[in-house]
Amino acid sequence: MAEIKIVGTAHVSQQSVDEVRAAIEEFRPDVVAIELDPSRFAALKKQGRDPSVNDVLEVRNFNALLVQWLLAYLQRKIGFDVGVEPGAEMKAAIEDAEKHNIPIALVDRDIRVTLLRFWNSLGIAEKIKMGWALIISIAEVDAGQEIDIESLKQQDVIDMVMEEFRKFSPNGARALIDERDAYIAHQLILLKAQRPEGRILAVVGAGHRQGITNHIDNPSTLTPFDSLTREPKSFPWAKIPLKMLEMNSIRPIPS
């Protein structure tokens, strides 16, 4: 019978890098599943470049990509302060899988779909709150506020953070966390069916580990796969600020 092992990581943690490498060495999986979609996988291979104006236009939603941009800046800043490149644990999983000739499965939902569903799910008040929260978080990190990265992987801390996020933005939590938990669980169950005697190692963010595990243990709780992949419609006026950026070569978030 196929076996699935899920490693929960912090995205800017040297300990997570070490844990991923150790898990591959000890578990000897037949496939390594990572919490990336093809576009993020390609970006990681390019050393995590910032989204260009063309990328923004391709996503077709300025506000959604701005959220991604702010989150990426915050993650890079934290990574610089703790001496670990953002996404280093995913890179470690990719590098070690390739070194051992282990197939890699990209099991996360298309980032464009996630961002569009996330932004479209928010009401005006939630969007304003989200923007201010991100700006304040960046300001706190820039001011040198210490962050205990490893504590973010402790289950009680994870539960508290997830609960606070759900209170802060219930709709956002559904799109960013719950839907992706279900999507990744669907993908892992499919991999398990394809490899009845295989060993599957999944490398995911610590905040997703419990939700994914619950779905795998109780498949009846899963949302139908098709309903998780629909891309909501966006409005043409969302491109106007982007065209202005393109003409003026302005980058709203410094790298």
Spans of features found by a protein language model:
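Compositional signal for N-terminal targeting/processing segments
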Residues: 1-255
